[in-house]
Swiss-Prot record:
Gene: POLR2M
Coiled coil (residue ranges): 15-69, 303-328
Organism expressing this protein natively: Bos taurus
Biological function: Appears to be a stable component of the Pol II(G) complex form of RNA polymerase II (Pol II). Pol II synthesizes mRNA precursors and many functional non-coding RNAs and is the central component of the basal RNA polymerase II transcription machinery. May play a role in Mediator complex-dependent regulation of transcription activation. Acts in vitro as a negative regulator of transcriptional activation; this repression is relieved by the Mediator complex, which restores Pol II(G) activator-dependent transcription to a level equivalent to that of Pol II.
Listed name of the protein: DNA-directed RNA polymerase II subunit GRINL1A
Biological processes, Gene Ontology terms: maintenance of ER location; transcription elongation by RNA polymerase II
Length: 370
């Protein structure tokens, strides 16, 4: 009985759930390698049934993992939007809690109407300003302007003027005490809280400008507004709209397409060029590509001949061809017969050694005759 090599044993379903996708693919590759080994499969008692079952389970697990990963990639932008919205809601909830604490400090007053003081109003106003600087929200500036106007009319003793009495302070703020008493009712606490949250704002002391009251829907727009898409989503959409052309295969002696396209476009836009100019450009293009020049023409270009001239040329070509064939035949025959064609001299070399001798008297007589 032959056992499986180490690392090729079929895995249990519990182990498959804990494996990563790369490990599952590696295991599938090993099991398929075992199945291809026919001799090894024949030696097994179950003839490779366990291995085939393991291959089926691995394929199912890999398909499930890929499907889950595809779904997660599809819903990844949605999860990002949900996370951003949750962050915005958490920020707004924190603003609500801080604003509620500031409203409680602002609305805290004694049951007797004459026990409120300007110092409490000033401290509550400072607290609300600090909270507004940390988390600015949208809203009107009506109640904050009233509190500032009241504090400016009754300056503190540190500026040099006497502080007003508690009765005068309570008379100067009747509306504030009434609002504090109305907020004690539990039924209208939520509505008043939303109203106060909308009214908290920051006013620049150097610039006195009034803003109109905002609608309650603007507060909900803080977390329900359109969220900006991630950068990679914009890149993918842009690439889907404008796909890149496939890279052309490199070929020798071929220039890139861009200069050729530009030159052809210029030729189309320009005036028609003559045949000589086109021939010169083609020759220059050929020289640029191959760095080779055409050989000069040894013959005239083709011409239209008459029938008589063509017959005369054919006869001349036939005669020259026959002469060449006769010379070749004679040369072959001489090679077969071992005949060497040499110059014939019957007298031999000895006749050239002797020179003709003339007498001096004969030379003188010839001169006298002249």
């Amino acid at each position: 009985m032959s056992s499986l090599p180490r690392g090729f044993e079929p895995q249990t379903p519990e182990d498959l759930g804990q494996r990563s996708l790369a490990e599952l693919r590696e295991m599938l590759k090993r099991q398929e390698r075992l199945l291809r080994n026919v001799k090894f499969i024949c030696k097994l008692p179950d003839k490779g049934k366990k291995i085939s079952d393991a291959v089926t389970k691995l394929k199912a697990a890999i398909a499930e993992r890929e499907e889950v990963r595809g779904r997660s990639e599809l819903f990844y932008p949605v999860s990002l939007d949900c996370k951003e919205r949750q962050k915005a809601i958490a920020v707004v909830d924190g603003d609500r809690d801080k604003a509620q604490n500031s409203d409680q400090i602002l609305d805290t007053s004694s049951p007797v109407p004459g026990c409120s003081s300007v110092a409490n109003i000033t401290s509550s106003q400072t607290t609300s300003r600090q909270q507004g600087l940390a988390h600015p929200t949208r809203g009107g500036d009506a109640e904050a302007a009233e509190a500032e106007h009241t504090v400016s009319e009754h300056p503190t003793s540190s500026s040099g003027a006497p502080a007003p009495s508690s009765s005068q302070a309570s008379e100067g703020l009747p509306q504030h005490c009434a609002l504090g008493q109305v907020e004690d009712h539990p039924g209208s606490s939520d509505n008043l809280f939303i109203d106060r949250l909308q009214r908290i704002t920051i006013a620049d002391p150097t610039e006195h400008h009034s803003e109109g009251n905002r609608n309650p829907e603007n507060l909900a727009g803080l977390w329900s507004g359109p969220q900006k898409k991630p950068h990679y989503m914009e890149v993918l959409e842009m690439r889907a709209k404008n796909p890149m052309p496939p890279p052309h295969k490199f070929k020798t002696n071929v220039l890139p397409s861009q200069p050729r396209d530009s030159s052809s476009a210029c030729q189309r836009r320009g005036s028609p060029i003559s045949s000589e100019e086109r021939r010169r450009r083609d020759r220059k293009h050929l020289d640029d590509i191959t760095a080779a020049r055409l050989l000069p023409l040894h013959h005239l270009p083709t011409q239209l001949l008459s029938i008589e001239e063509s017959l005369a040329l054919q006869r001349q070509q036939k005669q020259s061809y026959e002469e060449i064939q006769a010379k070749l035949a004679a040369q072959k025959l001489a090679e077969r017969l071992n005949i060497k064609m040499q110059s014939y001299n019957p007298e031999g070399e000895s006749s050239r050694k002797y020179r003709e001798v003339r007498d001096e008297d004969d030379d003188q007589s010839s001169e006298d005759e002249f």
